[in-house]
Amino acid sequence: MTAIAAVIYGPDEDCDVLLTDFAHDLARAGVAVAGLVQVNAGASCAEIDMELELVGSGRRFNICQDLGSGSVNACRLDPAGLAAAAGALRAALEQPASLAIVNKFGRAEAEGGGLVAEIGAAVEQGLPLIVGVPKRFTEAWAAFAGGLDDRLPCSRAALDAWWARQVPAAAE
């Protein structure tokens, strides 16, 4: 059975930095990681620019659309950018990997879109999988994961401990 870690985080916790640092550290240590991590950069898209980085390649995909000053509370997710990132992740999942990481199970995934197919592909391949899950989407995540996940707090110690339990399985 595939091991799935759901990193549950609130609005005051930076899961993006946690997953990015974790993925980069593993990749530097020689672990084959197929994943997308979110890198929040400067101000070209309202307050922050949202980019997904394909782990290992450094390739980035802008997933933020500037909707103008009158859309402060609107969803700024760019479906075309997300689709391009999803395609790159799907291609990465076709290569040998020891771990898959998906930056977020958010609104798009809760509605059945976004990176749902790529999450499914990682599970189908039997890869250990880490997914960031905002607290506001835990109910949708629970319905999606069907109890097959380990819920983790948003901490490096929790991720390190979970990964240490997966290493023998990942090496097989």
Model-derived regions: residue spans:
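Glycine-rich P-loop/Walker A and Walker A-like loops and their local beta1-loop-alpha1 context
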Residues: 1-33
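Helix-adjacent hinge/juxtasegments
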Residues: 55-95
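Substrate-engagement module of ASCE P-loop NTPases
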Residues: 119-135
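A charged, well-structured terminal subsegment
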Residues: 153-172
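Short, solvent-exposed loop/turn segments at secondary-structure junctions
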Residues: 14, 108-111
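Glycine-rich, charge-decorated loop segments at or immediately adjacent to ligand/cofactor-binding or catalytic sites
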Residues: 135-149
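Short Gly/Thr/Asp-enriched flexible loops that form oxyanion-binding sites at enzyme active sites
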Residues: 110-120
